Amino acid sequence: MLNIKWIRENKELFDEKLSQRFIEPMSSKIAMLDREKRKITSLIQEFQHARKVKSKILGNMASKSGEEFEGLQRDVKHINEKLEALEHDLNNNNELNELLNMFPNIPDEEVPYGMDESMNKLVRTYGETNPNALNKQHFELGIKLNLMDFEQTAKISGTRFVTLKGDLAKLERALINFMIDVHTKEWDFFEISPPVLVRDNAMYNAGQLPKFAEESFATTNGYRLIPTAEVSLVNMVADTIIPREKLPIRYVAYTPCFRSEAGSSGRDTRGMIRLHQFGKVELVSITTPEESTNEHEYITNASETILQKLNLPYRVMLLCTGDMGFAAKKTYDIEVWLPGQKQYREIASCSNCGDFQARRMKARYKEFGSNETTLVHTLNASGLPIGRTMVAILENYQNEDGSITIPDVLINYMGGLQKIIAYSE
């Protein structure tokens, strides 16, 4: 959520930043709603003060009867009626909060202006792409290996689900352990095993609700399946005041993730690129405003390390204003090279959310010996999605005979297996 005080003091800049997100100017409407809310709040405070004064006089009166006493009683009753009406108006006039909840984060100064991914800025590349490489797509390879099943899975769960078998299931497990080991041992992230069912307020805190309600799966009794472990991890500091010396806090978690893929009809309908259920290792950092820019580079580099160790070509893109996520003020996308598609595809997003999530969930820190609190900054990065990493391995490590060479760093995690070959039932 954006800071209403900042909007109040920076109306023109606010409208300018909204225009970069392709949203019409809204400062005038917000100012009007804000004035109305502040006027009601001011009246409530005045009436509360008047009630306190009159109640004190009533309490000190020697005689609890007579015209003066009864007149004061009538005044207090009238004040209570006024207060009840004003508090009702304040509690039921949610238009300002509803409007603020629909605004995305303000783009950082470094974020390029642009409408879509074609305007994203290349930051760096890693590894060489080979235009003459074998180019079967991952689902062709997986099906031929008899280790990736879509047809029978569709009978169980419908489309956008997959069943992995044998050595591909083992590769999935190996990748999870490998990624967690790298992030905990080399990058100082603390491993968490969080819940995947959360309440709506946790989704709201993370910026998923109310705007993206249709993109998640909801239960009938008030829970939602997480679309990313970011939701669970950032909420670990909700409604807390953290001592400054404990920052940064860095969490890593592997969880299954669930997305309805609303609005993705016709996109990536084959294979494992876009599924309703997928596994992902997620990174979250909690830090101070002064350190969040450096922490953004740190968490992005941690994510990149996985691809470097797997020797997978990739590039890092700075997203433009029109392509950034809702809660982010600045985002790097990491895109891995897929020979089967002959293009780079997103495998990770690494975002600095500033105090956007922290304001929603009241996550603060304070210096030693101080009573003043400041909102923390939250950051997140994929570190990485297991399915898309498997896609990249299958396509980049495929052999002429359809087998898949295991990347060197995964051989021990695979129990010494160096190659995945077709499974014969």
Curated annotation (Swiss-Prot):
It holds the Pfam family tRNA-synt_2b. Pathway: Aminoacyl-tRNA biosynthesis; selenocysteinyl-tRNA(Sec) biosynthesis; L-seryl-tRNA(Sec) from L-serine and tRNA(Sec): step 1/1. The keyword Protein biosynthesis applies. CDD domains: SerRS_core (cd00770). Keywords: Aminoacyl-tRNA synthetase, ATP-binding, Cytoplasm, Ligase, Nucleotide-binding, Protein biosynthesis. It comes from the Bacteria. Belongs to the class-II aminoacyl-tRNA synthetase family. Type-1 seryl-tRNA synthetase subfamily. Homodimer. The tRNA molecule binds across the dimer. HAMAP family: Ser_tRNA_synth_type1. This is Serine--tRNA ligase. It comes from Rickettsia peacockii (strain Rustic).
